[in-house]
Amino acid sequence: MNGKLPAKSFSRRKKEDKQEWEPLQNQFSAIVLVSIMLASIFSVSFATSSLFKSITIANQGRIGFLKVPITYKSEIRGVFIHEAIYSYPHNWTIIAQTLARYGIDAVFVNDFDIFHRRPDSEITTAINAFHAMGIEYHACMNGIAESYNPDTAAVNYTGGKPDPYAQCPIKVKPYVEAAIRNYIGNHSDVDGIMIDYMRTGVHYCYCDEHRAAFDQWYYENYGEHVSNWTEFYPDQPKWNIYASWRNEPVSELVKIIHDTAKSLKPDIVISEAAWSYFSDCPTYWRKWLGQDTGRWIMEGWIDMVAPMMYVEEIYGKTGETLESCIDACQKYMTGGVEGKIPLLAFTGLCTKNATNFAAHINYIRSRGLDGWIFWRYGGPGVESGGYLTDITPYLEAITMPETFKLGNIQVSASETEATITWTTTLSATSRIEYSISQLFNATWETWGNFPYWRINHIQGNILENLTYTTDHSITLTGLNSKTQYYFRVQSEGPGGTATSETLILTTK
């Protein structure tokens, strides 16, 4: 795969457009964070990392959902609304009504970055309009590759700052936390945060802070300090060592986003617009972009992932095709179909026409993905003079079977048995996967002499009832007493498959 950006690499914002953003640094005093030297990536342990999200049920309990998360739906149908919309007259109510007619259940709105946010009145109007139509509102945050601030810009290995939109992940840490606190503090009804552009470039960052942090890590792991920095520059003998380490400061930002957002709103959904995997290559994004999606999934920092599958061709095991993207993402990123977290395909205008888009959606469904997001909105409610393509012909071309939700999971356990019940909003099958061991793990592997995290599914015991019902009940027998079991429930119907996260029960 070459180093070119995919179709989602937008042009920079227009100068007049920037004036509409509210500077976050003017609203909050900087959050002072104590700088902690980055730990070695090789020290990450399965025992201490969040390989599953769990709710422990001792003996008897109930996992109730005041609000069923979108990750528990049989198919997620989203539309991305790019920041270009703010440059044109637009009506959020008309946009929401339009998308509701086509069965869209979530929008991902590009309304803030590390340093700026759209006016709160604009965001409130948008959230209210979509919520009125039963559509979730996920705020999309531009990360370190698309946030403007010359003062914290990344430094390349020659000492220059050629791109003020490319940020140093160490310098922006307090700004990232402030941005999340500010956004959720002002818009607590937001349903999710999508992390976008959380990646760096080949030549970044070599600022003093990065050099000091890397030097300390290098000393702790190799027993010596850096004596010749040239060896760690791109295409030089030790660049792979630096390239692998530089994922750590970026990953720290994702952890900050997760921890801050969840502390303010525990049920908020954190997602990522990720660089896709092409042609069975699991290291490109980590080596060349500093984007460690596998680590973020392993740690539980993101709840769902949407790789950018901006390709026109569907079939082909190699090259930039939809098939190769899905093959690689399921293989390395989620641990297979109905994997560790929901896997969505970012698609849309890249398909060129409505007929091809319908074919893409049919293929995505046939491969068992958990949904899709259309990039990007144009149509009723936006007067862009044709700049933003009307997507309604695309949406009209696809079939939209009714989707359902899964929730109200309850467990009643004895010494040797456990009965698990749940409900679905439409009739569907019943299935439970359980094991005394974790259902997913992550392994530190190499490809092309470069390391990466791979998510693996360790299949457990399966109990299944193919009878369609909305009230589901399965009893696990032959269990050990006073033992912890990992499990997840799943239901399948005409509208797709809904799967819970990995949960825990404990027998008496």
Residue positions per predicted region:
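Secretory targeting signatures
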Residues: 1-58
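Boundary/entry segment of secreted carbohydrate-active catalytic domains
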Residues: 59-95, 99, 274, 350
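Catalytic domains of carbohydrate-active enzymes, especially glycoside hydrolases
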Residues: 90-115, 188-189, 302-305, 367-372
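Polysaccharide-binding and catalytic clefts of secreted carbohydrate-active enzymes
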Residues: 160-302, 308-311, 315
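Short, surface-exposed linear motifs at loops/turns and structural transition points
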Residues: 402-508
